[in-house]
């Protein structure tokens, strides 16, 4: 796998230093598939009642795509995202990432897989206040076999990629909300994950900072070829993604092309 030509950037869009990326299949349009959900249902028990958070979901997400999962509160967006990230388990059906069936993995296997392939970004940044931006971004690498010098190179590359090369020694209290989210994104990409999973990444930001973060995610997708799956309520997000997936009451109701797509926008019914 070739590295990007950008100076000092080691992020490749494919899991360069943590383990081999999985082989991938192709969808009906010839695009490589990053994620495939096949008749996935997720139910929970609440007292004597069964709650169906996701109901027979089938969809694919293309490799190097930037997709938004949207719908009203309680529609199952975060549940779907948690299944893709290997944080939760499907009650039935199959979740494939590349050619790896993650629904059959035990907790130990799933944790190891998640560390290799998934970068997580949340609405709240979850930065440790006693650590600098550099030290916060370095945290995931402390669990790897990289040397201190190698970790330094990866951290500097990640912070440069999010536009914070000059803020490495700053503590969270010295950063704006948008800058804190950039640190959180750098922490998510520092291991060069296969997929970046973002849950309401602009939900705690003002309008300008939110748009800056969406532009950054677009850059990571376009320049560094990251597959990005984002849950959001923010209608502005539709301008920045390739495809919007719509959920309602746990049901996948269709998809439409986003503003970054080269195709005409229009509702597309889910595949049978």
Regions found by a protein language model. Give the residues of each.
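ABC family nucleotide-binding domain
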Residues: 35-249
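Conserved glycine-rich cofactor-binding loop
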Residues: 15
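Flexible N-terminal pre-Rossmann segment of NAD(P)-dependent oxidoreductases
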Residues: 1-8
